[in-house]
Amino acid sequence: MNPTEAKAVKTEPEKKPQSSKPSVVHEKKTQEVKPKEHTEPKSLPKHSSDTGVKHAPKEKAVSKSSEQPPSEKSTKPKTKSQDKISGGGKSTVPAAAAAASAEPADKNKENKLLTSAVPAESKPSKPSGKSDMDTALDDLIDTLGEPEEMKEDNTTYTGPEVSDPMSSTYIEELGKRESTPPPKYKELLNKEEGIAGPPPDSLKPLGPNDAIDALSSDFTCSSLQLTTCSPTADGKETEKEKSTEEALKAQSAGVIRSAAPPKEKRRKVEEDTMTEQALQALSASLGTRKPEPELDPSSIREVDEAKAKEEKVKKCGEDEETVPSEYRLKPATDKDGKPLLPEAEEKPKPLSESELIDELSEDFDQSKPTEKQSKPTEKTEASPAAAPYPVAEDVPRTSMCSLQSAPPTAAPAKGMVPDDAVEALAGSLPKKEADPEDGKPVEDKVKEKAKEEDRENFGEKEETIPPDYRLEEAKDKDGKPLLPKEVKEPLPPLSEDVLLDALSKDFTVPSDTSSPQFEDAKLSAVVSEVVSQTPAPTTQAAGPPPDCARDNKELDDALDQLSDTLGQRQPDPDENKPVEDKVKEKAKAEHRDKLGERDDTIPPKYQHLLDDNKEGTPGKPKDQRAQGIRNCGEKPAGAQDPIDALSGDFDSCPSTTETSTDTPKDKDKKPASVPKHLGNGGKAKDSTKAKEETSKPKADGKSTS
């Protein structure tokens, strides 16, 4: 149902009885004029066809009544008759639904056909005034086919009776209508102005005609009048305008100034309106939209673009080089062209209490000047100098919002400057005495009662150690505690003279010596320990005579003989004992033959070396030393004895035969046991001696020649 039709029904209630009295005589005429438009589908029930026949005389009566008024109001009865027909159709639909079970789709189609038949019935009564739009609509309606036949559903309901015990009661909201608010509240509303009234009974949406009228009112009419208070010029003015005014007033919540649209404009708009059924039929005659063809993905080709490379471009001003010379910052220079140093910012000095009081009490009551007391006041750059007030003006009562000052008692005298008043006020204050406690350090007022307590650490005493973790005394097999090992008495320290005498014993035998005599065993042990612990003292001996040439080889032999003269070291009983490994390893030792360990593993080209050793050179280092001593004794005439060469500076005696004869005796007495600290040195000497023996024949050949 169109909203314009509903409004037309509401606005003209006085014309309803005229058009609502149908005559039975006109039923046959309407059926003869338009038999096509009243044809109902065959499948419809009987009661639906009866209702259609009943509506026909009403439509005819409406068309006749609409012809009587003048042409200006001819459009209104049409809309009214349509509204009544549609209203009548609506009233008969529930009755038809109660009589038989017909589908709601058939009823809607039936109502549409009835409403579309109304403008077609007015053809014979008014053929001359028919517009082209009406004829086009009639032709379009004729092209529509009959509705499809629907099979009747004759199944009867055999279930239990359906009952709806619920009842609905409508409760009206307070203040929705003018009659609902209490009388006292109405008085308050009447007293206050500018408050919008209550909303209307039912807010109906504006139709297209009302919207067009409201929008085109300002263009068509120049004179403005208040719609809320303007009286209607025509006595037959309908309630349609009032309803539009109420709707506009509710939306804008204020007074709206608009002019009523002219009647000619309204008539044209109503004539041009098309019904919904005609628009639906027109849209159905249009063809369906063809779907767009889908794109074939195989036809799409990928475009290969060159790979973009990132290049870093220097921006203007990023570096100092890119900034133009005109825009570069130039440092400030003096007359000589040297850059000026930045001036140090002067920090404002903190104000004292007296200065703060002076500044705060500046605008308060100023006493009369008695004598100008000059007191120097330190003023910083931050506090600007106060300008003198004009003579006629009074000092303001307050300078700060948070301070409340007393009213001024007297106006300042002529020529009075606020600085003088501040100085006078500051001079009246006593001088601040220095607090002796200012320089003292802050003492803690909180006294702690913590005391230091000595606590024994766990394990510090044997009592605090658990029995499982205490050290057990070493016991023997019988369970007796082992006696502590006797500490060896440390040997007496020897002076440098005693050591020199012990070392040079074999070289010189001085007649008058007061050195203590030690046993050979003790002396050898002491000497070996001292040599191992401390380095031997360096003695500077006089150089050999220039006419006797000495060879490095002879010096080495002399040193070897000197090392043999050292006493024997007492063997340590625990030295040869194997070290017991507490960690038991499961690794098994495998014996592998080393190259040269047996005669079979020696290559044939090295066999002659072994044969030479068997014949001449012994394999042990002891025999090598003995052989070296023999070779030294068998030197040809002209070669000097190495012992004589070394002991020449120490011994003043000319005879050297005794020392040469004593050396084999000492060697026979002392076995070839080398001290522990000289073990590595002996091995090194053996290797050097083997090289020297090979070079001995060459040296002998040179000496003989």
Swiss-Prot record:
Sites of the modification Phosphothreonine? 115
Q: Per its record, what are the GO molecular function terms?
A: calcium-dependent cysteine-type endopeptidase inhibitor activity
Keywords recorded for this protein, A-Z: Acetylation, Isopeptide bond, Phosphoprotein, Protease inhibitor, Repeat, Thiol protease inhibitor, Ubl conjugation
User: Residue ranges under compositional bias (Acidic residues)?
Assistant: 135-151, 355-364
In the record, which positions carry Phosphoserine? 65, 202, 230, 352, 354, 361, 428, 504, 515, 563
Which residue stretches belong to region Disordered? 1-211, 226-493, 527-705
Modification type N6-acetyllysine: residues:
28
Output compositional bias ranges, type Polar residues. Answer: 275-286
Question: In residue terms, where are the Inhibitory domain repeats?
Answer: 149-202, 292-344, 434-487, 571-624
Q: Which stretches are transmembrane?
A: none
The protein's matches in Pfam families, at most eight in alphabetical order, are given as: Calpain_inhib
Q: Where is the composition biased (Low complexity)?
A: 63-72, 94-103, 533-542, 651-662
InterPro entries the record matches? Calpastatin, Prot_inh_calpain
User: Biased-composition ranges for Basic and acidic residues?
Assistant: 7-17, 24-62, 173-194, 234-248, 289-317, 327-352, 365-381, 430-489, 571-625, 683-705
Q: Please indicate if the UniProt record lists Phosphoprotein as a keyword.
A: yes
Presence of the UniProt keyword Acetylation in the record: yes
Q: Where is this cross-link: Glycyl lysine isopeptide (Lys-Gly) (interchain with G-Cter in SUMO2)?
A: 10
* Entry GO terms, CC: cytoplasm
Q: What is known of its domains?
A: Each of the four flexible inhibitory domains can inhibit one calcium-bound calpain molecule by occupying both sides of the active site.
* Family indicated by similarity: Belongs to the protease inhibitor I27 (calpastatin) family.
Role played: Specific inhibition of calpain (calcium-dependent cysteine protease). Plays a key role in postmortem tenderization of meat and have been proposed to be involved in muscle protein degradation in living tissue.
Q: What is this protein called?
A: Calpastatin
Q: Which organism is it from?
A: Bos taurus (Bovine)
